[in-house]
């Protein structure tokens, strides 16, 4: 009997020692990449809290060091938009008739859905013609926008995709170019209109501007962004595809957007002024 008791005690002791190991391995497995939840839509990459935080910090730092890295800007936008900000933007669409229509129909802005030859044939000063002229002048295409990956809610993922694809329309309506000075000015406007954190964080890239550019940003573009961003309607609710023939000046008035000074023209005038001063100094020497 004593032997049986000892054996029973030994087996119980072995069981008690092995049980915590099993629990620990199960807990560790729950954070394993192999145990990641299934994607909720094509291209979706589910992230846990730590992964999302690392993505937000890493992409933000990378985008600050190289503001032309559109992939890092996109990743930062997605990582910092949840849990609150993208839902606020989605709710803004749900509270607006046009926004609800966009969410139902889910249009995409590409060179196939908006052919450039058609846009170029539209009346002068129309929204579509202005958009096409801006694309031609800046040498960009609507097909370069990355697909959303890191937002878990499928409907909110579309909202972020919609914002991303409408970004060039914001450029066209305001006339702001794609070089860094223009992008920062537009991001400041977008932040006050959409409250997407990435657009606000993008303003830190102003530290990388040349002193004269940074001075212009705080003297001209930031005050304009504050005025127009706070006064304008929610741009996410604009169904751009249905107003292509509308006069762009009329649209700006309806949306409450003040047209900023022509950034390219200002830079051209400054270059010419510097050239004249240089020639004058050479002649006087």
UniProtKB/Swiss-Prot annotation:
InterPro entries: Coq4 (IPR007715), Coq4_euk (IPR027540). Its cofactor is Zn(2+). Zn(2+) binds at residues 167-168, 171, 183. Belongs to the COQ4 family. The gene is coq4. Lyase that catalyzes the C1-decarboxylation of 4-hydroxy-3-methoxy-5-(all-trans-polyprenyl)benzoic acid into 2-methoxy-6-(all-trans-polyprenyl)phenol during ubiquinone biosynthesis. Pathway: Cofactor biosynthesis; ubiquinone biosynthesis. Pfam families: Coq4. Residues 1-38 form a transit peptide. This is Ubiquinone biosynthesis protein coq4, mitochondrial. It is a peripheral membrane protein. It comes from the Eukaryota. Its main location: mitochondrion. Component of a multi-subunit COQ enzyme complex, composed of at least coq3, coq4, coq5, coq6, coq7 and coq9. Disulfide bonds: none annotated. Signal peptide: none annotated. It catalyses: a 4-hydroxy-3-methoxy-5-(all-trans-polyprenyl)benzoate + H(+) = a 2-methoxy-6-(all-trans-polyprenyl)phenol + CO2.
């Amino acid at each position: 009997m004593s032997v049986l008791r000892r054996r029973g005690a030994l087996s119980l002791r072995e069981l008690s020692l092995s049980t915590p190991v099993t629990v620990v391995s199960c807990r560790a497995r729950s954070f394993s990449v192999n145990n990641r939840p299934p994607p909720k839509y094509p291209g979706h990459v589910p992230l846990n809290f730590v992964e999302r935080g690392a993505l937000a910090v890493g992409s933000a730092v990378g985008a600050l060091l190289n503001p032309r890295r559109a992939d890092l800007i996109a990743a930062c936008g997605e990582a910092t938009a949840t849990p609150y900000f993208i839902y606020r933007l989605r709710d803004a669409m749900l509270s607006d008739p046009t926004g609800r229509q966009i969410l139902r129909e889910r249009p995409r802005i590409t060179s196939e859905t908006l052919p450039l030859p058609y846009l170029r044939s539209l009346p002068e000063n129309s929204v579509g013609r202005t958009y096409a002229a801006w694309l031609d002048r800046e040498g960009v295409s609507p097909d370069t926008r990355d697909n959303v990956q890191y937002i878990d809610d499928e409907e909110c993922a579309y909202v972020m995709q919609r914002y991303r694809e409408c970004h060039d329309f914001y450029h066209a309506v305001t006339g702001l170019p794609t070089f860094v000075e223009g992008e920062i000015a537009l991001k400041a406007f977008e932040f006050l209109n959409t409250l997407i954190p990435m657009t606000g964080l993008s303003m830190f890239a102003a530290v990388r501007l040349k002193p004269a550019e940074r001075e212009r940003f705080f003297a001209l573009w930031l005050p304009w962004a504050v005025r127009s961003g706070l006064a304008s309607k929610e741009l996410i609710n604009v169904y751009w595809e249905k107003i292509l023939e509308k006069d762009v000046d009329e649209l700006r008035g309806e949306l409450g957007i003040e047209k900023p000074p022509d950034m390219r023209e200002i830079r051209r005038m400054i270059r010419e002024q510097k050239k004249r001063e240089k020639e004058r100094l050479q002649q006087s020497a």
